[in-house]
Regions:
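Conserved N-terminal beta-strand and adjoining loop/helix that marks the start
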Residues: 1-18, 38
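Generic C-terminal helix-cap and adjacent flexible tail
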Residues: 1-2, 126-132
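Hydrophobic packing within well-folded, soluble alpha/beta domains
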Residues: 12, 45, 49-54, 66, ...
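Active-site-adjacent beta-strand/loop module that shapes the phosphate/pyrophosphate-binding cleft
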Residues: 13, 60, 70-92, 102
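Conserved Nudix-box catalytic region and its N-terminal flanking loop in Nudix hydrolases
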Residues: 17-55
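Short secondary-structure junctions
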Residues: 56-63
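NUDIX/MutT-family hydrolases
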Residues: 85, 94-125
Length: 132
């Protein structure tokens, strides 16, 4: 089975809300996800995440602590997703690849249809946010 390794950012505002982005393409169109993308060969998860947020959202983030690494089997590939707490350093999270976005608090985090691998991390993300 093909293996894909990605990094994803849980971008957290000062008020504890987190940023979610909605896919506008492909098999999982209209599902929600934490922004990020594939690691290039020899690239660290943190560097990949910084690069992907710059490419997808025209913004700079500070990558913080690892919240969880999800291992998930999609029908066509195995995904390893490293999910990091992050904060916005500059930019306005301009959507360059996604169709929609929203800020969610702990109470509303379950109100969107997450990608299956992202869904696997929701409990850990909630626990992380409760500790802030």
């Amino acid at each position: 089975m093909k293996r894909v390794e990605v990094a994803a950012a849980v971008i957290i505002r000062e008020d504890g809300f987190i940023f979610a982005a909605q896919r506008g393409y492909g098999e999982f169109k209209d599902y929600w996800e934490f922004p990020g993308g594939k690691l290039e060969e020899g690239e660290s998860a943190g560097c990949a995440l910084t690069r992907e947020i710059r490419e997808e959202l025209d913004s700079e983030i500070e990558v913080g602590s690892l919240i969880k690494t999800v291992e998930y089997d999609y029908p066509a590939f195995h995904l390893t997703m490293h999910i990091y707490a992050s904060t916005l350093v500059s930019g306005s999270l301009k959507l360059l690849e996604h169709e929609n976005s929203m800020w969610l608090d702990i109470a509303s985090i379950d109100s969107v249809k997450w990608l299956p691998a992202d869904e696997e991390a929701i409990a850990d993300i909630k626990a992380y946010l409760f500790r802030l």
